[in-house]
Amino acid sequence: TLYFIFGIWSGLLGTSLSLMIRTELGQPGSLLNDDQLYNVIVTAHAFVMIFFLVMPVMIGGFGNWLVPLMLGAPDMAFPRMNNMSFWLLPPSLTLLLSSAPVESGAGTGWTVYPPLSSNLAHMGPSVDLAIFSLHLAGISSIPGAINFITTIINMRWEGMMMERLPLFVWSVFITAILLLLSLPVLAGAITMLLTDRNFNTTFFDPSGGGDPILYQHLF
């Protein structure tokens, strides 16, 4: 229920951002009169919709509710881990929203692309807040994925083979596995970006021997 409430609230927020984007694009002149502000709205809209609407509602809400029902299990394998997974999301959303009013906001597109988010183009804490927000959202989804995989493998009714599972359970299972495979790569990319910005490393800076294309590959 908490996942649904959180998802609905974030969805309303994301929809309001979406309406601003549509209004800006749906008329000949400029509505906001500020390209940077428009980019900030696009960036925030993408993050809010993916990490705080689709994932909590589809996986957190429907997943936690329907998967145990479809398996004949009394609950998820690790209910407390589920709880921990949820309570990392509100601070993550808070960090993302606080990145918008700080300085000129993180208007880098939803990938937080390095040339745009270098310390020259984006000085100060705005992009860093967006990156920390991504970290928290990622950390939140890892225990959730482990929980789903463990539940589906270990908590089926006796006699319920894997090939008899409903397709919804299979879809959650495969999604969780793919999430665990892909998240460390994304975490590595944004951690390297964070150190590039704050500790003068040159993972993505060609002048220091780094590779500017590497980030796109990782992402």
From Swiss-Prot:
<keyword id="KW-0349">Heme</keyword>
<dbReference type="GO" id="GO:0015990">
    <property type="term" value="P:electron transport coupled proton transport"/>
</dbReference>
<feature type="topological domain" description="Mitochondrial intermembrane">
    <location>
        <begin position="23"/>
        <end position="39"/>
    </location>
</feature>
<protein>
    <recommendedName>
        <fullName>Cytochrome c oxidase subunit 1</fullName>
        <ecNumber>7.1.1.9</ecNumber>
    </recommendedName>
</protein>
<feature type="transmembrane region" description="Helical; Name=2">
    <location>
        <begin position="40"/>
        <end position="60"/>
    </location>
</feature>
<keyword id="KW-0812">Transmembrane</keyword>
<dbReference type="GO" id="GO:0020037">
    <property type="term" value="F:heme binding"/>
</dbReference>
<keyword id="KW-0472">Membrane</keyword>
<feature type="topological domain" description="Mitochondrial matrix">
    <location>
        <position position="1"/>
    </location>
</feature>
<keyword id="KW-1278">Translocase</keyword>
<dbReference type="GO" id="GO:0046872">
    <property type="term" value="F:metal ion binding"/>
</dbReference>
<comment type="pathway">
    <text>Energy metabolism; oxidative phosphorylation.</text>
</comment>
<dbReference type="InterPro" id="IPR023616">
    <property type="entry name" value="Cyt_c_oxase-like_su1_dom"/>
</dbReference>
<keyword id="KW-0479">Metal-binding</keyword>
<keyword id="KW-0496">Mitochondrion</keyword>
<feature type="transmembrane region" description="Helical; Name=4">
    <location>
        <begin position="129"/>
        <end position="149"/>
    </location>
</feature>
<keyword id="KW-0813">Transport</keyword>
<keyword id="KW-0249">Electron transport</keyword>
<keyword id="KW-1133">Transmembrane helix</keyword>
<dbReference type="GO" id="GO:0004129">
    <property type="term" value="F:cytochrome-c oxidase activity"/>
</dbReference>
<feature type="transmembrane region" description="Helical; Name=1">
    <location>
        <begin position="2"/>
        <end position="22"/>
    </location>
</feature>
<feature type="transmembrane region" description="Helical; Name=5">
    <location>
        <begin position="167"/>
        <end position="187"/>
    </location>
</feature>
<keyword id="KW-0186">Copper</keyword>
<feature type="binding site">
    <location>
        <position position="29"/>
    </location>
    <ligand>
        <name>Ca(2+)</name>
    </ligand>
</feature>
<keyword id="KW-0679">Respiratory chain</keyword>
<keyword id="KW-0408">Iron</keyword>
<keyword id="KW-0106">Calcium</keyword>
<dbReference type="GO" id="GO:0006123">
    <property type="term" value="P:mitochondrial electron transport, cytochrome c to oxygen"/>
</dbReference>
<feature type="transmembrane region" description="Helical; Name=3">
    <location>
        <begin position="86"/>
        <end position="106"/>
    </location>
</feature>
<comment type="function">
    <text>Component of the cytochrome c oxidase, the last enzyme in the mitochondrial electron transport chain which drives oxidative phosphorylation. The respiratory chain contains 3 multisubunit complexes succinate dehydrogenase (complex II, CII), ubiquinol-cytochrome c oxidoreductase (cytochrome b-c1 complex, complex III, CIII) and cytochrome c oxidase (complex IV, CIV), that cooperate to transfer electrons derived from NADH and succinate to molecular oxygen, creating an electrochemical gradient over the inner membrane that drives transmembrane transport and the ATP synthase.</text>
</comment>
<comment type="similarity">
    <text>Belongs to the heme-copper respiratory oxidase family.</text>
</comment>
<feature type="topological domain" description="Mitochondrial intermembrane">
    <location>
        <begin position="188"/>
        <end position="219"/>
    </location>
</feature>
<feature type="topological domain" description="Mitochondrial matrix">
    <location>
        <begin position="150"/>
        <end position="166"/>
    </location>
</feature>
<dbReference type="Pfam" id="PF00115">
    <property type="entry name" value="COX1"/>
</dbReference>
<feature type="binding site" description="axial binding residue">
    <location>
        <position position="45"/>
    </location>
    <ligand>
        <name>Fe(II)-heme a</name>
    </ligand>
</feature>
<dbReference type="InterPro" id="IPR000883">
    <property type="entry name" value="Cyt_C_Oxase_1"/>
</dbReference>
<dbReference type="InterPro" id="IPR036927">
    <property type="entry name" value="Cyt_c_oxase-like_su1_sf"/>
</dbReference>
<feature type="topological domain" description="Mitochondrial matrix">
    <location>
        <begin position="61"/>
        <end position="85"/>
    </location>
</feature>
<dbReference type="GO" id="GO:0005743">
    <property type="term" value="C:mitochondrial inner membrane"/>
</dbReference>
<keyword id="KW-0999">Mitochondrion inner membrane</keyword>
<feature type="binding site">
    <location>
        <position position="24"/>
    </location>
    <ligand>
        <name>Ca(2+)</name>
    </ligand>
</feature>
<feature type="topological domain" description="Mitochondrial intermembrane">
    <location>
        <begin position="107"/>
        <end position="128"/>
    </location>
</feature>
